[in-house]
Amino acid sequence: MTAYQLEGRNSGVTTADRILDSAQALVQVRGYNGFSYADISAELSITKPSIHHHFPTKAALAEALIARYRERFAVARKEVDDDTAGPRQRLVDYAGLYAQTFADGGRICLCGVFAVDAESLPVAVRHATDAFFADQRRWVAGVLAEAGVPASRVGAAAEAYLAALEGALLLARAHGQPDGAGGGRDVIRSVAETLVDALL
């Protein structure tokens, strides 16, 4: 499967890009409440005022992270649509995005992390997180409908599929093995294929 640019590793040369890359990795491993600007400052050897210049608040940084993640997922979904024949395989390849995320150092979905922290998030960040999941539901529902899932079931089926992928990432982290047979990526792909077969 194609390797998609989701995780922001060395994605740009500007200071803002480097800050976003660092923050994304921190969120995906520690959670929104598990990092501070001091962590980014130490990793990138830049001052905290420099970070505040680009992202005045942690909430502003989080919104920028989610906006970039939404855009990258949109590009990846289009590539799945363009590269893959048939709805079943498109759903399996879409799950590969989640497996790829985990393969990058045991990370989990950026917006899945934000969802876990939802009660402590600023309202704007919660809304941005909701918008990300709305994008995913819309696409998955469209593929399921194309596969012939009845309209009365499409919404619930899309929710179930997304919930399974997000949960599979947590199980993969519990396994603690990004690579190798039986490791995290295999867990994610197995969950996806099993659920796709059940839904279609």
Question: Where do the protein language model's features map onto the residues?
Answer:
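Hydrophobic alpha-helical connector segments
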Residues: 64, 68, 77-107, 157-161
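N-terminal intrinsically disordered/low-complexity leader segments
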Residues: 1-14
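Helix-loop "lid/cap" segments that line or gate small-molecule binding pockets
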Residues: 80, 97-102, 110-120, 143-146
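Amphipathic alpha-helical packing segments from all-alpha helical-bundle domains
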Residues: 74, 89-93, 104-108, 122-147, ...
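Hydrophobic alpha-helical segments that form the core
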Residues: 108-113, 151-174, 183-195
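Short amphipathic alpha-helical interaction patches enriched in hydrophobic/aromatic residues
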Residues: 77-81, 122, 144, 148, ...
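Helix-turn-helix
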Residues: 18, 22-60, 64
